[in-house]
Amino acid sequence: GAGMATKLFLRCTTANGITDTGDGVVQDMITTAGSAATTGVVNTITGDNVQVQWTKTAGGLSMAWISGRVPAGGFTLTTCDLDAWCQENNMSANCSVRARVYRYQPGTPTITELGGPFDDDVEFGTSAASMTWIANVTDTAFAENDRILLRLFIEDAPAVNMATGFTCTLTFNAANATTGDSFFNIAETVSFKAEPIVGTP
């Protein structure tokens, strides 16, 4: 119903243990906010209608985020929205943010893109600012132990072409309601399963 939703913070932790998505690092996307801001930095390229997946460091590992496991009974994912703190190091970079949303099914993983891509279409400034936009995904049933996978990209901002030689920074993992509290909202109320504690007897 109205007002029911689940807010999933983009974290820099990797308690999920997932390594089979093809991404360089798969970070947690959970209901608990972080405590200290961290960043991902990505190099720009030249082009029109191009995208570059956000990286942990410039030229480094690509980043993705994944939810906990869906609880018994499952749910249907419908409308999502995002709030990501983004900036470019020079206004000549001509970048904005894009999200791609997927269903991750475990085993030999099946990763299904749920419509999109979903573009904010607002060029970044040169200081960290909250970019907010809607991801109206294809309504998709998630079964128990499925997960939501999120990838963020830079793309060329409207009416301009991305230019090479610059960087864009995503700030995330910060405390709630502070600069860098990047998050992904889903319309449904879902209590994702906690990750198993690794390394305890």
Which positions does each model-derived feature cover?
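Proprotein-processing/basic-patch segments
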Residues: 3-68, 72-79, 83-89, 147-201
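Aromatic- and Gly/Pro-enriched, solvent-exposed loop/edge beta-strand patches characteristic
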Residues: 10, 94-163
